[in-house]
Amino acid sequence: MRALGPGSVSSFLKTILDVVHYALWVLIGGALVFALVSLLFSFNPGLLADRVPFGERFAGLVERGPAFATVLVAGAAYMGGVLAIVDILRRIFVTLTAGDPFHPDNVRRLRLVGLIFGGLEIGRYILAAVLALMMTGQVRTVEGTLNLTTWFAVLVIFVLAEVFREGARLRNEAELTI
């Protein structure tokens, strides 16, 4: 089985990325709708009280509605970052399917994937701090771990971008050679 070109593994992966792309749009829309609904219920808990018996299990949800909405909006933003990464990867796989892996635009695309991936991790740290503030009402040290796997992946992506840059340079030199 070939790695590049039409009918190859790269074209199969491009199809999978297309499906994930549209699924992420649906998930983002759903998260934003649920965030809006949770905010509406936190401001007016009697909105559906007559029609839907929530019981005691959901009594705490009214007080924590804004925090729940914050988590949903942050989740939608995170999925938006993942959507951006998937969209960039789709463009990279278009060049792989065309048999042109060292296209000069792929260098920029890989660097952008690394930046977005790192930004998502920093956003995760910020969300943990904001939620700690919202839940306790006071600024405190956030218990969390530095995800070394994620930061290693970011570094690998930047190294791959440099490998692609060198490949594009060599391809350009080969095109100039008679």
Question: PLM ranges: what are they?
Answer:
Residues 2, 82-101:
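Membrane-helix interface/capping segments
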Residues 46-64:
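Perimembrane loop-to-helix junctions flanking transmembrane segments
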Residues 119-178:
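Alpha-helical transmembrane segments of multi-pass integral membrane proteins
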Residues 29, 33-36, 82, 86-90, ...:
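Alpha-helical transmembrane segments of polytopic integral membrane proteins
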Residues 99-133:
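Hydrophobic alpha-helical transmembrane segments of integral membrane proteins
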Residues 58-86:
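Membrane-helix boundary elements
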Residues 11-32:
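Alpha-helical transmembrane segments and their helix-start/interface "positive-inside/aromatic belt" motifs
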Residues 1-12:
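Short, Lys/Arg-rich, polar N-terminal cytosolic tail immediately upstream
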